[in-house]
Amino acid sequence: MAHLSVKLRLLILALIDSLIVTFSVFVSYYILEPYFKTYSVKLLILAAISLFISHHISAFIFNMYHRAWEYASVSELILIVKAVTTSIVITMVVVTIVTGNRPFFRLYLITWMMHLILIGGSRLFWRIYRKYLGGKSFNKKPTLVVGAGQAGSMLIRQMLKSDEMKLEPVLAVDDDEHKRNITITEGVKVQGKIADIPELVRKYKIKKIIIAIPTIGQERLKEINNICHMDGVELLKMPNIEDVMSGELEVNQLKKVEVEDLLGRDPVELDMDMISNELTNKTILVTGAGGSIGSEICRQVCNFYPERIILLGHGENSIYLINRELRNRFGKNVDIVPIIADVQNRARMFEIMETYKPYAVYHAAAHKHVPLMEDNPEEAVRNNILGTKNTAEAAKNAEVKKFVMISTDKAVNPPNVMGASKRIAEMIIQSLNDETHRTNFVAVRFGNVLGSRGSVIPLFKSQIEEGGPVTVTHPEMTRYFMTIPEASRLVLQAGALAEGGEVFVLDMGEPVKIVDLARNLIKLSGKKEDDIRITYTGIRPGEKMFEELMNKDEVHPEQVFEKIYRGKVQHMKCNEVEAIIQDIVNDFSKEKIINYANGKKGR
């Protein structure tokens, strides 16, 4: 009955129950007629009316009409007993008060039994119909659930109750031997361990596999993904249990296993008190707030409830979107101020800093696309170098306490304009820190973030959807990858640790071959490598075969926090950096900016 609308289902159940409770008392009377001396038709009508009213009141009290009866179990039977017993007792009391006669208990006992048999039987009939006669018409996909714990049980029951999910749980698997062969709910048993999945998929013609282990680690997820990769089978996972328990997400809001899940790492436990001291009840400004990293920093900052957050960006649409999102989530507790401004506009940056006097600035505004900046090198200088200089000097003038610049691994030994512009931006930050004791300037350096705008993942996904080929520059090219939320959280932690002048380097894990990334995406799309061709296009201008997070002279062996290192980066004086910038602006060339960034003279 779950495929019917809620109102129609309620109406049908109420109508069936009305017929049962109205006529059962008359049937009971005729069964017991030889024993009656005082009962009349009027009294039977009174009893029928009382039963009709009291039953429907009890049904709503015990929520009988909002159950998925096609999956009824003992708990639903207990509800029927409670509702029927309550209505019989109420009727017995009403009739006794009205007539003044002692209640005829056998009549009520027979009526009670008929209610249980007929009402329970109507639900049982529907269950049998759905299971053996009508199930196929609902076009549910046979589903295997990985994990038979609390989350898995919750998910299976939700699938049974919801036709909207279009999933039919067939069985579960779990590596816990104590759960083997147990029945989670009628018809759904734990039938093996995770390694048995391929055999079980073939045996039961499974179309969907759902990982119902909310606290699963990344390495375990990789193992399960490798086991579950089969043609025509989609791998999904349920949301985190914390999101379900908090009400932020429903248990049935499943998501595909993405490459971000496979390349991401187990989250670092942050020093929440330290970060809270930096953000809570403070005014925070984020440049590039509409971008991939900038917008996630804004979300993470708002989780600590600053007094005000200033969303500064050049693109009005992206600022509109993040402003709307944050207002919906945090608008009651945080003053959210969207500002359309360009970091290249020096006067505007000074005006904004002076007006709002932020406690901390997270500078995420930057051009980051290597080939585009090779074709437009002057824009890299204006935005990444001069924009950083304007924003940082405005922050210094307004006596901002913390200035955190988002840098990149491409700033290490840069062979291209984009990386060189970010290295010179780091020089600006460090030199300004030497000039003031009121603002702590710091840079945080990390590699590629998964899923950011302009990254290879959206490109590869698009190419796979179009049937290929997937274009990779070189079979041996590697990159470091990190998820956007992880990078943003570590940026906040690094900012809280900053004492001034540091270039923090985030531990990016092991580098990943781009071709392996492409192969993973092809598998996750449900296709074989043979279905989608991979072609090699050659290294583009300014690209490196591999990236470095620190050069050999910058390596610092000790972590200052889990996954955060302090790079031993060479400092330059403010007047030296100023001279470099003036030379680049007055007589620009690609070679000059790259040479300066690598510690060589301009020419």
Segment roles from a protein language model:
Residues 1-139, 167, 230, 237:
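Signature of alpha-helical transmembrane segments in polytopic membrane proteins
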Residues 2, 269, 274-278, 431-448, ...:
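Strand-loop microenvironment adjacent to phosphate/nucleotide-handling motifs in alpha/beta enzyme folds
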Residues 2, 35, 129-237, 241-244, ...:
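A solvent-exposed beta-alpha-beta segment
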Residues 201, 205-207, 306-307, 353, ...:
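Proline-aspartate-enriched helix->loop->beta-strand connector
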Residues 221-283, 396:
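Flexible, Lys/Arg-rich cytosolic regulatory linkers and terminal tails that connect or flank
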Residues 231, 247, 363, 367-370, ...:
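Conserved Rossmann-fold NAD(P)-dependent oxidoreductase catalytic core, especially the SDR/UDP-sugar
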Residues 284-302:
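N-terminal Rossmann NAD(P)H-binding glycine-rich loop of SDR-like oxidoreductase domains
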Residues 340-360:
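Conserved Rossmann-fold cofactor-binding substructure of NAD(P)-dependent oxidoreductases
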